[in-house]
């Protein structure tokens, strides 16, 4: 027998570095692979064909390049053939030929050569897809006829938000753009902004002085006076029994609040020195008091004689909990004082960070459940770096550390921070620990709403509070770890310390890039992700207005510039020197890692084999590619949310970085990373579909004249993708072949994608829980079975949750595209009845996808609450996205409710509605609703039981449409109330939803009372008043005929719609010969150019009131506030006017369009000089208010409409200090047919006394703003939603915190927030956050006109 001898000192035999031929999954499962491409039979049988992956051979790279060139040439030939066929079909279309001939005739230049026309056609998308020809027969003719209609999305949906400190542009995909594109929402928001400004002016002119006084006293008292009063009453009883009659305590101190409110008198948001408005403090930012605000002398004097009793002795303590103030003071001192040294920062961090074992548990939990959401780290490298910083000897191990008590309690005493990358890794670790702690199932928000719709949704999807691993050993270990993590919350102040004092991120991202490296970019991406999803968890106290990504727009641009400076846009294979650097970094990390068994004696440093070095180099390149494509995805996501252009466009022109799937890594030891690269490829393909939509809606060159068939093609492809009828590769190829997606958006070499790893259907994702329960049983039962069939369950479930999010995004785009086409064709029904069919079809599709987004939003939050495994750790990461989808759906629901309740808009000729009703515009819109609203009283109850969230709603069922949609709004309001304590960005959504609910239902103010409600034809629960229209309200829908060039400031009141038919001819206008330059275009075509009425929305109500029955300089004739007053209180009955007043007073310009006749009166032309400019808004206190310019009554208006004067106001504050200067001028008077002499007697002189300046009470304000196209709306609702509802007729304003007592009556039910566990939130966040994301100062300098502390009313 021969023996093999080993020569001492001989080098070990070098192993062959051969690329395996079997797939990764078969080698992992240790089964024989048949090597079938692209997917082997073993993987197909076991159900993991989508994960079958082969490593590429090095020698096959050159051959692959040659094959790819041949394939590319073949694809180009096929594409040219398709384009030629489309061009021939395009030229033979009669409609296209006619439109092309018309465009040539109307063109001022014409076609210079016959070649120009084909070139222009070949550069644009050709025709509609063949798949779209299978439409309904009755829709075939309109589709063919209107295929080449052009839409200008840059004009209809672009929004410029003008703030007091700057401007923000919001594009067509932002959720606010819908209120500008829809005519009903546009007019409603215009009315709301008018009411808002008047309400602000009403507060300014004395009615809010009590509120301002309370605000100057420091807001809410930090003492619970209920307990204090109980102790005081008990103390008085004790005094009666035990103390003598003589009491030296001053009477002024008895019962006095012990808080020294003068110490808290500095108002938030107002600079008392400069008198200018300052940015508001965030909701969670508390002012650090220098001393205790409790007046302890008063407190001691009240309770001195009670020290004999132990119970009363306890009351001598300060009633304020100083612990939180001490903590805030410490944190504030660390950030606001002088810069801290590195050693001081490390000492503070050691106190804030948890023990070593807890840190390791956080990291393991992140890479097991959260890593697929933001996979830009290399797990092995990151753990090595953290081990180097904290000396965690067992961190590199993949197994759970032993639960030894000494290791578990071992705190962090020191940190090793030797290089700048350590700072970034430390910051990433803190963000990871914050995300994991906030996402623990125990921290999820419980949705315990008793609603029939929600209960049925739970029943249909079997959402129960049970774990898919219940009873198993893994479940008990997981629960134990999570309970342990729950005890160690990492303070967000630690992140601020690292970001400001170690990384110095503000300097790096703004002025310097000397310290930018890969770790810095990774930290910046993590920080943006943290701000997007955990804004309320940041110690910096981000306001609730930051949830929609506007505040982080510049942060992403900084990240992108840092990525360009590091060269991430170039593939790392282009730079051979990266191999040496990556090898050195790998060697350093390995040496600094945990000691191995061979190095226990410390004899020598462990050597790194060349194979390990090559693997490390490839992993570094892999991380390079992952970071770059994640930044590209963030750019697409931000563009979709904000409607802003993408920062990285035509990726193929600026970048050659390969997808992470091109990395030469063997994933047999890390199957989780294999899922990551599959997700990267799929998500990038989905981003390409989103890019195709963004190009047609946001790119000015395309969106300016986008054609209907292009949008139809996008809708068809996205619909087939979401329904599972087409794969993602087929959709992308279809978009490219039909010119909807440029090839420059697809990087070179990425045209060949995986055909199997596709987006699953939504039904399969939601049913994944049952399939997983069937596969994954008890731990003991799984022994001996094929446990590798699903490979890694947590990553699989997290990926499916991400698929759910992608489905919501794609379906939101389908809703947006259908909504755009619906709003384009809806108003054209008066001229072309065929467009009504198109409009109704698009409206139905938009409603279906809106309800689908709403339904998925509810499914997500219910699943999080019931701990569905699909969303078990996604309660923070997907919360904002789901809430945004539901909020967008709610906007369209409001659109439809307005159409059902208001009917066709006034001011139009023959209006075709989407509900199949043709109504003459001259008829009152309320009469249409009278037929539909005559329903039995139990209709609502029947629909409540028949309604189902899983079913779509048909627009033809207009009888119950509004009530079904309203029930969904009510449920969404209840949902946001439950989310508000945990997620600050849901506060604004909740207030906006509550505002519209209170606006569209009978308000709880004046019109909701039993006295007035009993006189209404439809009672308290209905929205309309039968055939009643307020005689003094203006005809708001006349704004539809306005021009777009004269409104400059208000983000909704600008760029009025330009799709209306031409106005009546000039011959119908009254004689206005004294107007200079009024008709610049009338002589050319004989028609009146659409012009806008004057902007009077910012004119104070006290200056141009239209329903105030008081004679000037007569306090005796003012409205009496006593019980013996005989004034008419019913707002539906206008008070009669005397003949003298009818002859003396004239109609105000703002209210001259309202009519009682059957046909609308023509509007006068307006010179641009008649517009209110910014100079008119500058306050000048030496002027007094005016009563309004005199205006002649136009033909067709009711002669009973008269201009009234102001009412006497009973408050001690003079009006001169709050007044605005007169906005009328000589040009304005001439433009409206008046002379300066005609209004000299109407204006008040600066010497006018206070008694002659009249202010209306709140009911007059309500009556003046009560009608929107026949729909009764109440300005009380605006005050309710803002949390400052006036009480009674005296104009007293309730406390800001009264919003927590806000109730909404709808469908005979009352919704009341749970104030028991949300008191602090409602008292802080809701009072300081407006329900509108647009601030109150749409015109620069408007705040200066008041110069008062009223900012907290809106902000």
Swiss-Prot record:
It holds the Pfam family Fungal_trans. Coiled coil: none annotated. Signal peptide: none annotated. Keywords: DNA-binding, Metal-binding, Nucleus, Transcription, Transcription regulation, Zinc. Residues 586-614, 918-942, 1221-1253 are annotated as: Disordered. Residues 589-603, 918-927 have a biased composition (Low complexity). One of its GO terms (cellular component) is nucleus. It comes from the Eukaryota. InterPro entries: bZIP_sf (IPR046347), Fungal_TF_Env_Response (IPR051430), Transcription_factor_dom_fun (IPR007219), Zn2-C6_fun-type_DNA-bd_sf (IPR036864), Zn2Cys6_DnaBD (IPR001138). One of its GO terms (biological process) is establishment of protein localization to chromatin. CDD domains: fungal_TF_MHR, GAL4. Residues 23-52 bind DNA. Disruption phenotype: Increases susceptibility to multiple azoles, including fluconazole. It is found in: Nucleus. Transcription factor that contributes to plasma membrane sphingolipid incorporation and membrane permeability, decreasing fluconazole accumulation. Regulates 337 genes under fluconazole stress, including several related to lipid biosynthesis pathways such as RSB1, encoding a sphingoid long-chain base efflux transporter. Associates with the promoter of RSB1 in the region containing two 5'-CCCCTCC-3' motifs and increases its promoter occupancy upon fluconazole stress. This is Transcription factor MAR1. The gene is MAR1.
């Amino acid at each position: 027998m021969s023996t093999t001898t080993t020569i001492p000192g001989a080098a070990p035999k070098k192993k062959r570095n051969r690329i395996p031929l079997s797939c990764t999954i078969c080698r992992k499962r240790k089964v024989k692979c048949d090597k079938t491409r692209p997917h082997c039979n073993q993987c197909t049988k076991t159900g993991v064909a989508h994960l079958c992956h082969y490593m590429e051979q090095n020698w096959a790279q050159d051959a692959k390049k040659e094959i790819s060139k041949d394939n590319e040439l073949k694809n180009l030939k096929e594409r040219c053939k398709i384009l030629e066929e489309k061009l021939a079909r395009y030229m033979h279309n009669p409609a296209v030929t006619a439109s092309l001939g018309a465009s040539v005739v109307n063109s001022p230049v014409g076609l210079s050569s016959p070649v120009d026309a084909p070139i222009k056609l070949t550069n644009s998308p050709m025709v509609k897809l063949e798949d779209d020809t299978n439409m309904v027969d009755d829709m075939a003719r309109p589709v063919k006829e209107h295929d080449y209609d052009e839409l200008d999305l840059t004009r209809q949906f672009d929004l410029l938000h003008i703030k007091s400190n700057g401007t923000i542009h919001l594009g067509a995909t932002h959720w606010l753009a819908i209120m500008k594109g829809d005519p009903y929402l546009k007019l409603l928001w215009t009315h709301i902004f008018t009411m808002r400004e008047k309400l602000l002016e009403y507060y300014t002119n004395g009615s809010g002085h009590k509120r301002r006084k309370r605000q100057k006293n420091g807001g809410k008292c930090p003492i619970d006076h209920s307990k204090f009063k109980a102790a005081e009453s008990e103390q008085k009883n004790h005094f009666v029994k035990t103390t003598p009659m003589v009491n030296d305590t001053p009477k002024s101190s008895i019962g006095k609040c012990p808080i020294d409110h003068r110490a808290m008198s500095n108002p938030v948001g107002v600079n008392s020195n400069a008198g200018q408005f300052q940015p508001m403090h965030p909701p969670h930012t508390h002012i650090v008091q220098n001393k205790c605000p409790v007046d302890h002398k008063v407190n001691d004097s009240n309770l001195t004689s009670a020290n004999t009793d132990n119970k009363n002795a306890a009351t001598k303590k300060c009633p304020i909990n100083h612990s939180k103030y001490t903590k805030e003071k410490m944190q504030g001192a660390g950030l606001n004082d002088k810069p801290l040294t590195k050693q001081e920062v490390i000492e503070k961090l050691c106190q804030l960070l948890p023990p070593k074992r807890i840190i390791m548990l956080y990291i393991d939990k992140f890479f097991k459940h959260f890593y697929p959401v933001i996979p830009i780290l290399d797990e092995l490298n990151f753990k090595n770096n953290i081990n180097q910083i904290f000396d965690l000897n067992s961190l590199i191990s993949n197994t759970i550390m032993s639960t030894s008590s000494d290791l578990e309690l071992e705190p962090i005493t020191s940190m090793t921070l030797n290089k700048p990358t350590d700072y970034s890794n430390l910051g990433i670790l803190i963000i990871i620990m914050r995300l994991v702690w906030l996402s623990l199932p125990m921290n999820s928000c419980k949705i315990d709403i008793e609603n029939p719709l929600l209960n049925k949704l739970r029943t249909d999807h079997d959402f129960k509070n049970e774990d898919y691993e219940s009873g198993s050993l893994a479940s008990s270990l997981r629960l134990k770890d999570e309970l342990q993590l729950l005890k160690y919350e990492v303070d967000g102040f630690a992140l601020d310390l690292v970001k400001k004092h170690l990384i110095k991120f503000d300097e790096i991202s703004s002025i310097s890039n000397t310290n930018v490296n890969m770790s810095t970019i990774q930290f910046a991406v993590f920080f943006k992700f943290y701000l997007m999803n955990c804004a309320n968890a940041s110690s910096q106290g981000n306001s609730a207005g930051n949830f929609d990504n506007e505040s982080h727009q510049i942060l992403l641009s900084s990240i992108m510039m840092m990525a360009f400076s590091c060269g991430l846009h170039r593939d790392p294979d282009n730079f051979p020197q990266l191999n040496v650097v990556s090898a050195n970094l790998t060697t350093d990390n390995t040496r600094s890692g945990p000691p191995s068994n061979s190095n226990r004696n410390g004899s020598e440093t462990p050597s790194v084999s060349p194979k390990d070095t090559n693997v490390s180099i490839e992993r570094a390149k892999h991380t390079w590619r992952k970071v770059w494509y994640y930044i590209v995805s963030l750019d697409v996501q931000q563009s979709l949310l904000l409607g802003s252009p993408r920062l990285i466009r035509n990726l193929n022109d600026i970048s050659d970085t390969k997808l992470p799937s091109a990395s030469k890594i063997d994933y047999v030891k890390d199957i989780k990373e294999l899922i990551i690269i599959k997700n990267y490829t799929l998500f990038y393909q989905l981003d390409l579909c989103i890019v195709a939509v963004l190009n047609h809606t946001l790119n000015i060159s395309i969106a300016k004249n986008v054609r209907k068939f292009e949008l139809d093609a996008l809708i068809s492809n996205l619909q087939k993708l979401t329904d599972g009828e087409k794969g993602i590769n087929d959709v992308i190829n279809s978009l490219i072949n039909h010119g909807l997606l440029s090839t420059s958006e697809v990087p070179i070499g990425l045209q060949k994608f995986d055909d199997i790893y596709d987006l699953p259907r939504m039904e399969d994702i939601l049913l994944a829980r049952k399939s997983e329960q069937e596969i994954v049983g008890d731990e003991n039962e799984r022994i001996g079975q094929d446990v590798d069939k699903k490979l890694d369950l947590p990553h699989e479930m997290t990926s499916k949750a991400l698929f759910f999010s992608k489905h919501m995004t794609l379906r939101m785009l389908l809703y947006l595209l259908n909504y755009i086409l619906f709003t384009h064709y809806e108003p054209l029904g008066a001229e072309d009845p065929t467009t009504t069919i198109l409009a109704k079809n698009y409206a139905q599709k938009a409603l279906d996808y809106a309800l689908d987004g709403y339904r998925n939003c509810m499914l997500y939050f219910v699943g999080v609450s019931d701990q569905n495994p699909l969303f078990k750790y996604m309660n923070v990461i997907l919360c904002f996205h789901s809430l945004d989808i539901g909020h967008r759906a709610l906007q369209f629901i409001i659109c439809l409710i307005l159409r059902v309740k208001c009917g066709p808009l006034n001011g139009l000729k023959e209006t075709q509605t989407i509900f199949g009703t043709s109504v003459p515009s001259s008829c009152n819109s309320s009469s249409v609703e009278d037929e539909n609203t005559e329903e039995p009283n139990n209709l609502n109850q029947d629909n409540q039981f028949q309604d189902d969230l899983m079913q779509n709603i048909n627009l033809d069922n207009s009888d119950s449409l509004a009530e079904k949609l309203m029930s969904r709004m009510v449920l969404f309001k209840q949902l946001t109330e439950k989310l508000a304590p945990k997620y600050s960005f849901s506060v604004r959504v909740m207030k906006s939803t509550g505002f519209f609910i209170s606006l569209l239902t009978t308000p709880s103010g004046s019109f909701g009372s039993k006295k007035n409600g009993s006189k209404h034809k439809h009672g308290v629960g209905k929205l309309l008043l039968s055939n009643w229209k307020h005689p003094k309200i203006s005809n708001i829908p006349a704004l539809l005929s306005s021009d777009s060039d004269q409104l400059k400031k208000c983000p909704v009141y600008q760029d009025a719609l330009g799709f209306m038919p031409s106005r009546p001819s000039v011959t119908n206008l009254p004689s206005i010969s004294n107007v200079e330059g009024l008709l610049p275009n009338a002589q050319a075509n004989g028609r009146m150019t659409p012009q806008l009425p004057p902007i009077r929305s910012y004119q104070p109500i006290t200056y141009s009131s239209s329903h105030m029955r008081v004679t000037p300089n007569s306090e005796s004739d003012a409205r009496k506030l006593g019980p013996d007053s005989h004034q008419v209180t019913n707002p539906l009955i206008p008070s009669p006017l005397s003949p003298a007043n009818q002859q003396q007073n004239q109609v105000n310009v703002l209210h001259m369009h309202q009519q009682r006749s059957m046909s609308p009166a023509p509007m006068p032309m307006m010179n641009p000089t008649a517009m209110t400019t910014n100079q008119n808004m500058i306050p000048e206190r030496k002027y007094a208010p005016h009563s309004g310019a005199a205006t002649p009554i136009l033909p067709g208006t009711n002669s009973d409409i008269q201009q009234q004067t102001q009412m006497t106001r009973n408050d001690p504050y003079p009006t001169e200090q709050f007044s605005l200067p007169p906005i009328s001028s000589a040009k304005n008077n001439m433009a409206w047919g008046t002379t300066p002499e005609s209004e000299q007697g109407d204006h008040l002189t600066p010497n006018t006394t206070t008694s002659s300046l009249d202010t209306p009470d709140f009911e007059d304000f309500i009556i003046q703003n009560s009608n929107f196209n026949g729909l009764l709306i109440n300005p009380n609702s605006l005050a309710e939603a803002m949390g400052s509802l006036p009480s009674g007729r005296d104009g007293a304003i309730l406390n800001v915190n009264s919003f927590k007592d806000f109730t909404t009556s709808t469908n005979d039910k009352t919704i009341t927030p749970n104030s028991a566990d949300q008191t602090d939130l409602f008292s802080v966040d809701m009072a300081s956050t407006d329900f509108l994301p647009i601030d109150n100062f749409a015109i620069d300098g408007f705040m200066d006109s008041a110069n008062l502390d009223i900012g907290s009313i809106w902000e």
